[in-house]
Design a protein with these regions (language model features):
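Short helix-initiation/N-cap motifs at beta->coil->alpha
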Residues: 24-27, 43-46, 61-75, 108, ...
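Acidic, polar ligand-binding/catalytic clefts
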Residues: 22-33, 95-106, 116, 194, ...
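Short glycine-rich His-centered loop
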Residues: 164-187
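Ligand-binding clefts/hinges and TM-proximal coupling segments of bilobed small-molecule sensing domains
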Residues: 46-55, 100-104, 126-164
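C-terminal motif of bacterial Sec signal peptides marking the signal peptidase cleavage site
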Residues: 15-19
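Periplasmic-binding protein-like
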Residues: 85, 89-126, 152-155, 172, ...
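Short, polar/charged alpha-helical segment
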Residues: 49-52, 181-201
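Short loop->beta-strand "edge-of-pocket" segments that line small-molecule binding or catalytic clefts
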Residues: 31-44, 166-170
Length: 257
């Protein structure tokens, strides 16, 4: 399936070649080999935290999204990327010169964030997640967005008319959970959010922004909930309330072949 964001990546790579630095040969076989490397990550993510806390001798390079990090890796500006497994697979599927290493770094769980104290919305979201897992809709979304053959199918989900709108905040550069297809933001989280909006009796609106600005937007009331492959960390729980987990992921390493 053609994805606009990775088409942008491919085009950008062509223009970036002129300014790329010499790529050093990097051999990574274990966590220890990551020390002293220049490692990219998405700002505000588990990968960034891992580099800062578990790899004190590595240089942490934080990017707005995985697309920018991938360009820097391809051009030799950084040596590796630490990112969630499924987005890493999408990157490597579209870039044959990159590959994934699973070094058992850390696992985490994704959950939906709401403003602290918004128990009405939180309870509704938890019920929707539970119902989806019971009636088969959750498994259907997994099959659509995480197929074994890699051929993603975007399901048609009826958007029920609602009384007012509910705004989902996300960073639409994290496939297959959220990404841009044509002019629309789609993905596993976006599809799940449509079910959440339907059950809550609201019309869904999706707001795309920088990942590390999502919690501030939630606290200010600019958005109603966050669905962005966000890990439910204890630090974040000080500022938001999280739903029950809906997906378990792990951090992997992307390197040049």
């Amino acid at each position: 399936m053609k994805k606009v964001l990775f088409a942008v990546l491919a085009v950008s790579a062509v223009f970036a070649l002129a300014g790329c630095k010499e790529k050093k040969n990097v051999v990574v076989n274990s966590k220890a080999d990551l020390e002293n490397l220049s490692i990219g990550c998405q700002a505000g993510t588990t990968g960034e935290i891992y580099i800062q806390e578990d790899l004190p001798n590595a240089k942490c390079n934080s990017f707005k999204n995985v697309i920018d990090a991938s360009l820097s890796l391809k051009n030799g500006a950084i040596d590796a990327i630490i990112i969630d497994e499924l987005p890493a697979k999408e990157v490597c599927k579209n870039n044959s010169d990159l590959t994934i290493l699973d070094l058992d770094l850390v696992t985490d769980v994704y959950a939906i964030a709401v403003k602290k104290g918004n128990t009405k919305l939180l309870n509704s979201i938890n019920k929707t997640i539970a119902d989806m897992k019971t009636d088969g809709r959750y498994e259907s979304l997994v099959a659509d967005f995480m197929p074994a053959d890699g051929k993603i199918k975007i399901p048609a989900i009826e958007a029920k008319s609602g009384n007012g709108k509910i705004i989902m905040g996300t960073n639409a550069a994290f496939p297959p959970f959220e990404y841009v297809e044509g002019s629309k933001i789609v993905g596993f989280d976006a599809a799940m959010a449509q079910y959440i909006a339907n059950d809550y009796g609201k019309t869904l609106e999706i707001s795309d922004m920088a990942f590390d600005g999502l919690i501030a937007a939630l606290q200010s009331g600019s958005i109603d909930f966050i669905a962005a492959g966000m890990t439910a960390t204890e630090e974040r729980r000080q500022n938001v309330d999280f739903s029950e987990p809906y997906y378990e992921s792990k951090q992997v390493v992307i390197v040049r072949k």
